Regions:
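Zinc-dependent deaminase catalytic domain
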Residues: 3-173
Length: 173
């Protein structure tokens, strides 16, 4: 499934949880804010078919960093590299792992990922002390829900946020 964004007014007038006490505020709620950052980061991925982004906030909801899936920095792949998903997949660095390289254990409290973290990435996020993880697209092969439950990490799907409709992250082919 792809993420959807229906209209600008939908988040303003929605019953989505907010991080402030002003219910009449038009301020973007934290889940949608951090997911929008993750989505924007995903647009930097060089993978022409699958773009994944991640963003981290500290305990005060300040941005720690953003990251995306991609190849080792400086590596220039030939066009034929992208032809086979199976072949290229083993070389791709996941957005969550790239993100974890930007902060120390316990520094990030909230992480948003455009796709539910795979099992290994979920383990890494838990090991880094992340307490809340937002994601848009589910990933059926991941054990993330079980890992989150075991470690007391909130794993919450967020599909209604700016950018999701206008800039798709999964392209056909």
């Amino acid at each position: 499934p792809t993420c959807t964004w229906t209209s600008r007014a939908s988040w303003r007038n929605s019953s989505l949880p907010t991080m402030n006490n002003n219910s009449s505020s038009t301020r973007l709620p934290i889940p949608q804010y951090v997911m929008t950052l993750a989505h924007a980061a995903a647009l930097r991925s060089e993978d022409p078919y699958r773009k994944v982004g991640a963003a981290a906030l500290d305990a005060d909801n300040r941005v720690i960093g953003t990251a995306y899936n991609g190849l080792y920095p400086g590596f220039k792949a030939q066009d034929t590299f992208w032809a086979s998903r199976e072949e290229r997949q083993k070389y791709m660095l996941h957005a969550e792992i790239n993100l974890c390289s930007l902060f120390r254990r316990g520094e990030a409290k909230v992480v948003a990922c455009t796709t539910m973290p795979c099992t290994s990435c979920m383990q890494a996020l838990c090991a880094h002390g992340v307490k809340t993880i937002y994601y848009c697209e589910p990933y059926d092969k991941s054990e993330a829900p079980a890992i989150a439950s075991l470690y007391g990490v909130e794993l919450i799907q967020v599909t209604d946020y700016p950018l999701s409709r206008h800039f798709p992250l999964v392209l056909d082919s």
